[in-house]
Amino acid sequence: MQAWVIGNWKQNPATSHDVNALLDDLCAAISTTKQMSHDNSARCQIMVAPSFIHLAAVNGRLKDTSILCAAQDVSGHSASVGAYTGDCSAQQIVDAGATWTILGHSERRQYHQESNDTLLQKMIHALSQDLGVVFCIGESQAQYDTKQTLEVIDNQLAVIKEFITQQPELIKALPTRLIIAYEPVWAIGTGKVPTVAEVSATHKHIKQILAGFADSLSNMTVLYGGSVNADNANSFAADPMIDGALVGGASLKADSFLTIATAFSQASI
């Protein structure tokens, strides 16, 4: 299975100048990596998710590279146009050059009170426009401490089950247009990291739940996110249940981001 390493830039960098500087560093690092291994991009797909305001410019810079471009969210109100101040629709995001979007990140769930119903509408809008979905799930510190991780994940994955019920004509797109990112909320940006064994067991559970939804979902890509960095990437990449990483802070430094991508690329040999 091809690995995926996705950089979620969140509300960074601050200026267009800084965005271009990061892209310069990233493209230079990618070029060096390809010189070391021509098959690198085939083994590990790299993708970055900039802010909406930088989406078109980043896509323009990356269109002749193997790096894909994703949005960080889509409107839950309309897939195309409408009187929804501040929203960006899936159609607009595709027009800007993105081929994927992140949905359900814990920061969106926390700061914008995104519910399963909201995320279902966003998923429908995205996939109806052939915009792939990186669907984020994960438990809080309190839920982890009280051993509710699997219960929480099952509840969050219910969005996908309901999507299949409501949109049977789109089921065929899911194996190639849906990625799950398991991100324990307590590990995001904190430096706290679950053990590889814990992540592996959780990923196995996620894959089993998805396979139970539909036969076509028996081999889904599941990424890990939460304080992934250049120092621990090899450990996560070595586990066959972990198909890649959703990277936050480390994706804002080209060298560390490419070190993570190289770890998963080499593990896919």
From Swiss-Prot:
SUPFAM superfamilies, A to Z: Triosephosphate isomerase (TIM) (SSF51351)
Chief place where the protein resides: cytoplasm
Alphabetically ordered keywords of this record: Cytoplasm, Gluconeogenesis, Glycolysis, Isomerase
Residues that hold substrate according to the record: 8-10, 189, 227, 248-249
Annotated metabolic or biological route of this protein: Carbohydrate biosynthesis; gluconeogenesis; Carbohydrate degradation; glycolysis; D-glyceraldehyde 3-phosphate from glycerone phosphate: step 1/1
Gene Ontology terms, MF aspect: triose-phosphate isomerase activity
Active site (UniProt): 105 (electrophile), 183 (proton acceptor)
Enzyme Commission code: 5.3.1.1
GO cellular component assignments: cytosol
Record CDD domains: TIM (cd00311)
Subcellular localization: Cytoplasm
Record InterPro entries: Aldolase_TIM (IPR013785), TIM_sf (IPR035990), TrioseP_Isoase_bac/euk (IPR022896), Triosephosphate_isomerase (IPR000652), Triosephosphate_isomerase_AS (IPR020861)
Catalyzed reaction equations: D-glyceraldehyde 3-phosphate = dihydroxyacetone phosphate
One Gene Ontology term from the biological process aspect of the record: glycerol catabolic process
Catalytic class of the enzyme: isomerase
Subunit structure: Homodimer.
Function noted in UniProt: Involved in the gluconeogenesis. Catalyzes stereospecifically the conversion of dihydroxyacetone phosphate (DHAP) to D-glyceraldehyde-3-phosphate (G3P).
Entries under HAMAP family matching the protein: TIM_B (MF_00147_B)
Family note: Belongs to the triosephosphate isomerase family.
Protein name, as recorded: Triosephosphate isomerase
Organism: Psychrobacter cryohalolentis (strain ATCC BAA-1226 / DSM 17306 / VKM B-2378 / K5)
